[in-house]
Amino acid sequence: MAPLAARRPACLLALLSVAAALFLTPTALAAGGKTGQVTVFWGRNKAEGSLREACDSGMYTMVTMSFLDVFGANGKYHLDLSGHDLSSVGADIKHCQSKGVPVSLSIGGYGTGYSLPSNRSALDLFDHLWNSYFGGSKPSVPRPFGDAWLDGVDLFLEHGTPADRYDVLALELAKHNIRGGPGKPLHLTATVRCGYPPAAHVGRALATGIFERVHVRTYESDKWCNQNLGWEGSWDKWTAAYPATRFYVGLTADDKSHQWVHPKNVYYGVAPVAQKKDNYGGIMLWDRYFDKQTNYSSLIKYYA
């Protein structure tokens, strides 16, 4: 099979020609199983514009803010939204929710300032999350977004050890998965590396069986699993291992990345493969900043 990612703009036409020759069939064109679901990460670059602007674009069905990047044994917490004015984010969250776009918070990220080495640290993190961003109201816990109430938590656990207790955190969050009345869940998601099986600390959390969705990052330079090599086999394993969880294909909107996939290749290659699975959920985009530059979501949304 031809590689799906565009390695260089110079070879783009060649890639498209090969993809068209391989995939231009009635089955590929039908591309069943579409959901129209597109999740985007927001908060990694101040130049990406406001959260309100992202929701008003009409391109996304969920926005994940990133990251709460410090937590764990030392009892300290840090929210990094890349210099965005936090005083306006609360109103933007409510605006997004009024438009039917849920907003979640991703914890972890690419830094190394987090861990959950014990049950106690996991419960302490839950307490911080619940009182800072959800339904809690401890006077001693500041609320960065005022009385805005988020819709979910995403685990983006790039670093960790087998001792980390993200399973305890997930189970505690699941006990509080109704916000504001019946039918309003606290969405519990995870954003994982492409390769399967996952690292031990991620696998232990997912083994709880309570994650609503998982975003599989196929756009990074993982030697054994990326858009040039191996992602389809890993996709099969991920979706089979957790049949009750919805899986999202993670794509980059950065057209300068070696792992960027041309929209036509999403249509002819990525979407038909991903949508064969009964628990296909949609597409996750990294991230709003790149998408604003390239308008990638406007080109792939209707293939999702």
Swiss-Prot record:
Q: Which UniProt keywords apply?
A: Disulfide bond, Glycoprotein, Glycosidase, Hydrolase, Plant defense, Secreted, Signal
Sequence segments annotated as region (Interaction with fungal GH11 xylanase)? 178-184
Coiled-coil intervals: none
Query: Which pairs of positions does the record mark as disulfide bonds?
Result: 55-96, 194-225
Instruction: Note whether Signal occurs among the keywords.
Output: yes
Please state the protein's primary subcellular location.
secreted
Pfam families of this UniProt entry? Answer: Glyco_hydro_18
- For region Interaction with fungal GH10 xylanase, the annotated ranges are 262-275
Localization recorded for this chain is: Secreted
In which domain of life is the source organism classified?
Eukaryota
Name any Gene Ontology BP term. defense response to fungus
Relate the protein's function as given in its record: Fungal xylanase inhibitor. Possesses competitive inhibiting activity against fungal endo-1,4-beta-D-xylanases belonging to glycoside hydrolase family 10 (GH10) and family 11 (GH11). Possesses also inhibitory activity towards barley alpha-amylases. Binding to xylanases or amylases is necessary for inhibition activity. May function in plant defense against secreted fungal pathogen xylanases. Is similar to class III chitinases, but does not exhibit chitinase activity.
Protein name listed in UniProt: Xylanase inhibitor protein 1
Source species of the chain: Triticum aestivum (Wheat)
Source lineage: Eukaryota, Viridiplantae, Streptophyta, Embryophyta, Tracheophyta
Give the gene symbol. Answer: XIPI
